[in-house]
Regions:
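Signature of N-terminal electron-transfer/Fe-S-associated modules in redox systems
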Residues: 1-163
Length: 163
């Protein structure tokens, strides 16, 4: 079966089996491995991608269900080659990642949150990431990273210049 997906702004036509998950399509057919297979039951959130700007579990959706939708993966959030988005930069600065397994999903979830709410409260951030499990950080640094990114995206708390 042929599906057309708009992945990271680029129209992609892919042959898939009717029961292939969007996660498997992204990883196996399009070689975009940023979305991770964790529980494969929609519980852990490691497979999160953005579909038309909203976080979605790619392990729970068939690729054919995504036909015609705009899908953003972690590979699509950087402003350019070798550059980091403000959210990615804040995660690095605050040590908001350790093993990195949940990081792509957390960053994509943060992108969706900050697109809808550029000035979130701590409670807004905690609520937004509550569907993503992290077993390493205890979430404090992740929340700090998202809050810092929100400030910077609003023009506040600029990073120090790099030499």
């Amino acid at each position: 079966m042929r599906v057309e997906l708009i992945v990271n702004g680029e129209m992609r036509t892919v042959e898939v089996e009717p029961r292939m998950s969007l996660l498997d399509c992204l990883r196996e057919r399009l070689l975009l491995t940023g979305a991770h297979a964790g529980c494969e039951h929609g519980v852990c959130g490691a497979c999160t991608v953005l579909i038309d700007g909203a976080p979605a579990r790619s392990c729970l959706m068939f690729a054919v269900q995504a036909d015609g939708y705009a899908i953003t993966t972690i590979e699509g959030v950087t402003p350019g080659p070798g550059e980091l988005s403000p959210i990615q930069d804040a995660f690095c600065e605050t040590h908001g990642m350790q093993c990195g397994y949940c990081t792509p999903a957390m960053i994509l979830t943060a992108h969706a949150l900050l697109a809808d709410n550029p000035d979130p409260t701590r409670a807004d951030i905690v609520d937004a990431i509550s569907a993503n499990i992290c077993r390493c950080t205890g979430y404090a640094q992740i929340v700090e990273a998202i809050a810092l990114a929100a400030e910077r995206m609003r023009g506040l708390n600029r990073p120090a210049r790099k030499p």
